[in-house]
Amino acid sequence: KFRGYLKQCEQDLVAYAPDVLILVDYAGFNLRMAKIAKERGIKVFYYISPKIWAWNQSRVEQVKARVDRMFVILPFEEEFYQKFGYAVDYAGNPTADAVAEFEPTNDFFERNRLDANKPIIAVLPGSRKQEIEEMLHEMIAILPGFQEYQFVVAGVTNLDPNYYRNFHRNGIRFVFDQTFDLLSHARAALVTSGTATLETAL
């Protein structure tokens, strides 16, 4: 399937012959597309750098050879690429900006009917049904060993609130679209990988 999609995109690229190919994230696929484009003399712009600083720094040379202009969303990525003589553009990060502007509310416990005397463990299972179904049961399975805490799940309103009833247990509460507030009041957090990890770290 992967190779089929790659071949189809290559055919479309050749047929359309754009001046610039703009790629977004998804390194496994897009670095291959970047190579195909460069071989055909098409400029390549890339938004959201592959996380090569974390898993394979030797691939910087591959990026330099295939990408004409890289737009990064993490400030330290600029410095990382500079070490290899590759200039990139910091495009900013909506999540980092939102966290910087956020101010915790004083009535979080009262508004959500939480116990102000019991520390919170925040549970961030993601925002898509598939990842929630894969992760949330596993996350809340540890609850019996932490009775002195209240587990609060960060729900999202793009899903039907009734959907979360599948995960109701004694000792588990849900709040919706209040992730930053929840994290700011939590003692610890269980987090699915992805944007939520960045939100928690910030």
Please provide the spans of the model-predicted regions.
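Phosphate/pyrophosphate-binding betaalpha-module
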Residues: 135, 140-141, 159, 167
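A conserved nucleotide-sugar
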Residues: 140-156
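Nucleotide-activated donor-binding/catalytic signature segment of Leloir-type glycosyltransferases, i.e.
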Residues: 163-178
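A donor-sugar binding/catalytic signature common to diverse glycosyltransferases
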Residues: 176-202
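Active-site and donor-binding regions of nucleotide-sugar-utilizing enzymes
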Residues: 1-110, 124-135, 146, 156-158, ...
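Charged active-site motifs of nucleotide-sugar-dependent glycosyltransferases
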Residues: 115-122, 149-150
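Glycine-rich phosphate-binding loop signature in dinucleotide/nucleotide-binding domains
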Residues: 12-17, 114-117, 185
